[in-house]
Design a protein with these regions (language model features):
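Conserved PLP-enzyme active-site core in the AAT-like
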Residues: 11-212, 217, 222-223
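Aromatic- and Gly/Pro-rich amphipathic surface segment
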Residues: 1-6
Length: 224
């Protein structure tokens, strides 16, 4: 069901969001070059930094909103994989998936998008040129705060085969009952995301008008 919502051909359900990140990382070859956003989720930063320190991967953190600087990094290292997180966690920085994916294809780089914060209701990375989309289904996808889970989805048969191989090897697939509860959550995802947007807008308006608040980070603001 989640694969259909993301316009993928299949994927793997994992035991957590970080298990999804770990699964993708394990599909890479030794010394693969990876570009990540400088402000992505802390767990993602810690994992890839540790893999860099162990000499497993070559990892480069960049400001992906600066397309000129990003293009320079592409030219310098010719990455094997580009990791995108938009909006980013926690500062909600927004980048253009389609533009970055186009640049990545020129360098034959795979593109992964962490779509946790928007869900397939509001953003479909595979339709914008990404090869893989991942989620921490613990959050919006499930929406009931009663499971921990993740998911990795692709529109490429070769990548899908690799994902299934490594998910089985690592033993990080999701539990059946957690998957059942997540499927329940998917049934109300569209309605919940609509309400989340309305609630967030109301909170942002309140905070923006308070003289006690210095800065509000929210993609819906014109000055974001």
């Amino acid at each position: 069901a989640l694969s259909d919502l993301e316009s993928g051909i299949g994927g793997e359900v994992t035991s957590s969001g970080m298990a999804a990140v770990t699964l993708i990382a394990n599909t890479l070859r030794l010394n693969s070059k990876v570009i990540l956003p400088h402000d992505c989720y802390g767990g993602t930063i810690r994992l890839f930094t540790s893999l860099k320190e162990k000499g497993v991967l070559d990892v480069y953190f960049t400001d992906q909103s600066d397309l000129i600087a990003l293009e320079k990094t592409f030219e310098e290292i010719n990455p094997d994989l580009v990791w995108i997180e938009t909006p980013s966690n926690p500062l909600l920085q927004v980048v253009d998936i389609e533009q970055i994916a186009q640049k990545a294809k020129l360098h034959h780089s795979l593109v992964v998008v962490d779509n946790t914060f928007l869900s397939p209701v509001l953003q479909n990375p595979l339709l914008l040129g990404a090869d893989i989309v991942m989620h921490s289904s613990t959050k919006y996808i499930n929406g009931h705060s009663d499971i921990v889970g993740g998911a990795v989805i692709t529109n490429n048969e070769e990548i899908l085969t690799d994902l299934k191989f490594w998910a089985n090897n690592l033993g990080i697939t999701g539990a059946p009952f957690d998957s059942y509860l997540t499927l329940r959550g998917l049934r109300t995802l569209s309605i919940r995301m609509e309400k989340h947007e309305k609630n967030a807008a109301a909170i942002v308006e309140l905070l923006s008008n308070s003289d006690k608040i210095k800065t509000v980070y929210y993609p819906g603001l014109l000055n974001h």
